[in-house]
Amino acid sequence: RREKDTLSDDEFLVNDYHDAQDSFLSAEVRAMMHTYESQWSAPNIGDDETRPKIFYASRTHSQLVQLVHEVKRTPYGQGDEPVRCVSLGSRKQMCIHHDVRRIGALFGTEAMNERCLELMEGKKGKRCPYLPAQSDPVGRAEMDTYRDHALSHVQDMEDLVQLGKDMHMCPYFGTRHSARHAELVTLPYNLLLLRDAREALHLTLDGSVVIIDEAHNLIDTLLATYAAELTQAQIEQAVQQVEMYLRRFSMRLRGTNEEQVRILQVLLRALQGLCVELTESQTFSLPDFMSRLGGSVDQINLVRLERWLKDTRIARKMGGYADKVWLETHAAPAHRAVAMHALEAFLLALCNRAKNGRVLVTVDKMQGVRFKYLLLDPRDAFEPIVSSARAIILAGGTMEPMSDFEQLVPRDRFTTFSCGHIVPSSHVMGAVVPLGPKGQTLEFTHASWQQPAMLDELAVALGNYTNIVPHGMVVFFPSYATLDAALARWQHTHALERLSRRKKVLTEPKDAKDVDAVLQQYAATIADPPPSSPKGAMLLAVVGAKLSEGINFQDDLARCVVMIGLPFPHAKSRELAERLAFAGEDGRDMYVNMCMRAVNQSMGRAIRHRADYAAFLLLDRRYAREQIQSRLPGWIRTQVQVHDRFGSSIRALAQFFQQMRYRAAT
């Protein structure tokens, strides 16, 4: 029995590891040693890479698909020799192995990745049938055939997945193998922006052109990509896994493996002790955090430890063994490698002991302690891309305000080009409304949302506008809390009922899965207004939520967009407070830019083609200030008028829609 258990447990024993620190290998060679994840994207001898090439990154899968479809329509996507284009995606998007996809659906991305790697190793004879061994000449030829078919004509991700199914070949690794010979590579943000992802894919940006679409998201994405969280529960679970692993394999660990497992145990116990010691939330610089862990932890070579974790894939070994032990007494696996992966990501963040990082510690009596690494300055994360690429294009429909982006690249390399809007200026009407119908000053600060008089004035203002605006009207609130405050007041005063007699009132749901149903109801009401709401519909939305980012309101869906107040982010949030403090004198500009970028994105949901038109009403006297107006998009800024009286905005709005009706008739 003991001999049988030993044999069955061998798959969890970490392989002998020779530290690159002792063998004097370069970082490039170490990257080549990542056998499994990068095997089909790594170069072969004599396998020349296509250069230069274009890397096109965007935020969502649908935007990448749309780009490929547009390429197909150009001369570059047609003819006998179209541009060699390939799309890279995640396992969730591209894996065709039923069991791996099922595990991903049940247990998440990390579990899906773990199962894929297990099948790649081929332990117990269970190798992925879609991925041949790199050492297999026949398999190599089949992968080359996939590459040739993938690059023969322009195809989107769905096409490449179907090609994999037809050829019985893994499209996830097939596209990575194809990327070396592509001229145009489309990929999601994280594969471009994360250094580890670029290394795993062997993406060489030298001399290439990098295009980042939807670039208004770039700074936030960089900061989020390099953030890392670790909870007390994950620390406790990781401690248990390391101790369980040592009880089983301590006598069989040698050299670096034994040393690093012991170091890992010391670090985890220090984190465990700090969780007990801390009684209130606080913020540490990286050196202070390491010092607070106490003992000899500050002397640990975190770079070496993190590299060992990554090279040996010890997280999967420990998690797999913990799952095996768990299964002996439970019915289903717990996928315990997740805790070790969270630890690995956190250690990677700690390896950057620069002045631009902070560790935020949150102490909660119910949920325990949570550590979060926060990157304060996105420039360090973006600099490797800037220094490698021949050119970088930051593109977006609404990029203003631009000053934050100027800090990402050297000033001598930064130029701007802004196209005019596709619609004539006469199709855009902008109005700053500082006063309500009864003369109430409109300034929607945090305190004003608790003032009944202000909310009553807002309801009357919207009621007046609904008499004039045809079809659809989208009203953006700064937050769900402010929307809830307005709705509560209007229900109490029956103002909501009065508004609904003109336009059917719908509100943006907090659950994203319910958004489509609300949009369908909104569009249906506009297309065929009921007698109870003869003037169409009004959609109450939230800045920064689903409707302000990913939804386009063209034609009758948004003949008027109303911005209520200024959506300044919560300045007292710990993360934002740290960013603003780090920015110093530039902090105020950064804060205003965050607000106005959100405003501009919301307004940009309307007017989607050259025949479209819309009015934009800015209900807050602060929109009259130069520092606010100067940050509006040019196509709106040139059309904005400040109205000293509410009635003036009513007349201007009525005149605008009268002109639009006249032009449509002629």
What do the predicted segments below correspond to?
Residues 480-509:
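Conserved helicase motor "Helicase C" RecA-like lobe of SF1/SF2 P-loop NTPases
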Residues 52-60, 393-397, 471-478, 482, ...:
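Conserved RecA-like ASCE P-loop NTPase motor core of nucleic-acid helicases/translocases
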Residues 384, 441-478:
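Conserved interdomain hinge at the start of the Helicase C-terminal
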Residues 157-182, 193-202, 305-440, 447, ...:
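A contiguous, basic/glycine-rich beta-loop/short-helix subdomain that forms a polymer-engagement track
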Residues 432, 526, 576, 617-666:
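N-terminal targeting/trafficking signals and adjacent low-complexity tails
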Residues 434-453, 506-625:
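Conserved RecA-like P-loop NTPase helicase motor core
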Residues 205-231, 235-236:
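SF2 helicase catalytic motif II
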Residues 1-183, 190-193, 240, 247-261, ...:
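A substrate-engagement module of RecA-like helicase motors
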